């Protein structure tokens, strides 16, 4: 198991998934354009929802790429982690809309696993990650994300404690 790499990845996954929340707190709805453009899926429900924005994805990728450089990894690894974490988040949102859950609603597991598992799988060969590295990182991210969400809420960064 690569403990130092797991720590680096946890920091980067937290940056990737936390950046859109922090940016939204500081910028509000300014420069906030929904990725789905307000389109509805064949079921009549929003494709992704208004909280998934181009701004959030772009900032996530840029901040995660910069964070990777600062953490001693290649910037492009950070860009891939950020991009695929956002793809996982969009996948979760798509599934949540199909389940009838509104934007911002909680779906424990679905809110944490794709946005951590997908990027780790995408970088597994580049970073020589083992199945154990991936499993431990996803589990730690899951717990950490739940704790950070509560803290973000307590410090008024997030509107809900999840």
Located regions from the model:
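Interhelical loop and helix-boundary elements at the membrane-water interface
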Residues: 1-80, 86-122, 128-162
């Amino acid at each position: 198991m690569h403990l130092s790499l797991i720590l680096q990845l946890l920091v980067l996954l937290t940056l990737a998934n936390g950046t859109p929340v922090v940016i939204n707190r500081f910028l509000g709805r300014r420069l906030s354009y929904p990725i789905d453009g307000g389109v509805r899926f064949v079921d009549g429900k929003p494709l992704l929802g208004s909280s998934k924005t181009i701004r959030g994805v772009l900032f996530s990728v840029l901040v995660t790429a910069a964070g990777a450089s600062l953490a001693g990894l290649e910037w492009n690894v950070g860009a891939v982690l950020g991009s695929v974490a956002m793809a996982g988040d969009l996948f979760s949102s798509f599934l949540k809309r199909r389940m009838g859950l509104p934007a911002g609603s909680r779906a424990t597991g679905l809110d944490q696993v794709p946005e951590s598992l997908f990027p780790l799988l995408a970088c597994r060969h580049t970073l020589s990650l083992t199945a154990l590295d991936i499993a431990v990182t996803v589990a730690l991210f899951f717990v950490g994300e739940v704790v950070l969400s509560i803290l973000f809420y307590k410090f008024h960064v997030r509107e809900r404690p999840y």
